[in-house]
Regions:
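Terminal, low-complexity interaction segments
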Residues: 176-253
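Short catalytic/ligand-binding loop motif for oxyanion handling, primarily in non-cytosolic enzymes
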Residues: 43-44, 159-161, 233-235
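Extended extracellular/luminal ectodomain segments enriched in beta-structured repeat modules
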Residues: 141-150, 220-221
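Short glycine-rich beta-strand segments
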Residues: 153-156
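Short secondary-structure capping micro-motifs at structural edges
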Residues: 131-141, 165-172
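N-terminal targeting leaders for non-cytosolic proteins
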Residues: 23-133, 138
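Short coil-to-beta strand junction motifs in C2/discoidin
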Residues: 162-182
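Bacterial Sec-dependent N-terminal signal peptides
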Residues: 1-4, 11-42, 248-253
Length: 253
């Protein structure tokens, strides 16, 4: 099972007695969604699910569930990844000229955040109709809720390569004003609760390590919508995600 860690005082059971003998059960949990197995013995089976992306670095499915959180992607008839979220485990911190860029390798000497061995890759595309949501959280009833807390983001090697050396499609290196931007939008009952923008590449500057993004301003959510935009046409719209934190509250009355 892919890791969904419980942080802090993970579960609190509250029983309150009233005049009518009513009570409620309340579970308050900090969830950490890490895109790798819980246990070492599961690693080999996990690795065997990887394919595509060069050197067996990618695993994809129309829906990847980790705890109560679903991560969606779009596949073609041959089950090749078209867009959305997939899992990856490659790394490449070399963006020198002539390097063959990888769309799925994180631009880092290590792999995931905190040195983990896997992470997620998000790809935004208009080439295929994407799922309704990028990430959706299972909320069991009307009294329960979830709030996004944070996520760690990073660049893929192909994006850095294209920004530093150009795309090879009559597009030169990035200059002032050029960008690759990730937008994370929280929604609840299909209504926007808040938006967070992250500059992955800004002119000649770009993320060189896993970077924490605070998401508490998004408020209570039941889904996250991710979008990548660039100032350049035909730019590789990919980024990496890891260690996504949520505050999850279940209340049964």
């Amino acid at each position: 099972m892919i890791r969904c860690a419980l942080l802090g005082a993970a579960a609190i059971l509250a029983a309150a007695c009233f005049n009518k003998g009513d009570y409620k059960n309340e579970y308050n949990t900090h969830l950490l969604i890490a895109f790798e197995p819980d246990y070492e013995y599961e690693w080999e089976e996990f690795v065997n699910t990887f394919f595509d992306g060069g050197k067996d670095t990618v695993a994809c499915s129309p829906s990847i569930r980790i705890g109560p959180v679903y991560h969606f992607s779009k596949l073609d008839e041959a089950e090749d990844f078209l867009g959305g979220i997939c899992l990856a485990r490659g790394k490449d911190a070399d963006a020198s000229a002539g390097r063959k860029p990888s769309r799925f390798a994180v631009f880092d000497a290590k792999v995931g955040d905190q040195g983990s061995r896997a992470y997620a890759v998000f790809h935004d595309t208009t080439a295929a109709q994407m799922p309704e949501h990028t990430i959706q959280i299972l909320i069991p009833n009307e009294t329960s809720s979830c709030a996004a807390e944070f996520a760690y983001v990073h660049n893929v090697q192909a994006a850095v390569q294209a920004a530093v050396h150009g795309t090879g499609l009559a597009e030169g290196p990035f200059q002032a004003g050029d960008y690759l931007k990730l937008t994370i939008t929280g929604t609840l009952d299909k209504k926007v609760t808040g938006t967070k923008e992250v500059a992955l590449i800004d002119g000649t500057s770009y993320l060189k390590e896993w970077t924490k993004v605070e998401l508490t301003d998004l408020g209570k959510i039941d889904a996250l919508e991710l979008h990548l935009t660039s100032s350049r046409a035909d730019f590789p719209l990919y980024c990496c995600l890891d260690d996504m934190g949520y505050y999850y509250q279940e209340i049964y009355e």
